[in-house]
Amino acid sequence: QLGRIIYEMIVLEIDSVKEFMQHMFQGSMFDRFHLRSCEVTTFATFHIDGRCFDDWFDSDEKRTDETGLVTWNMMKTFVFSWIKGNKVPQKMLFDFCHYMPNGDVGSIQIRYEKDKLQFVTGYMQKEFSLEKKGQQAWDDNCLQFIKKHEIVSTQLE
């Protein structure tokens, strides 16, 4: 990822944290996204580096694609086990990504802290360009994604 230019485009404040988390952990909302990293703070801070080590699996169990990253579907049950219970986590950060055919990468960060949940988009270009169509398309797709799942949010400036 070194050398990529990261653009942060939109920040959405999610109105219903509980509803969003149900989509995330019990639904399939993010299942196809790759998980670059995850950090959850409860009584301790837990980290996940999303790199998948295929050598760990048997040959008939190969789990990753060319990205070398795990998918959210592979990890959500594991992460949910850290947070289920009577107390909410102090902090959570999820860094999801989607690889484009042209080599660019769209990202979504989910940031939770102090009862506030934010959905933040980003875009990394494989090569420097003044062209912003890919970034705008990613933004538009993310907004449609939120709308499709009927998530109520407020766009922050």
Language-model regions: role of each:
Residues 21, 35, 94-96, 110, ...:
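Generic structural hydrophobic/aromatic packing signal, biased to beta-strands
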Residues 1-12, 147-157:
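Short amphipathic alpha-helical segments
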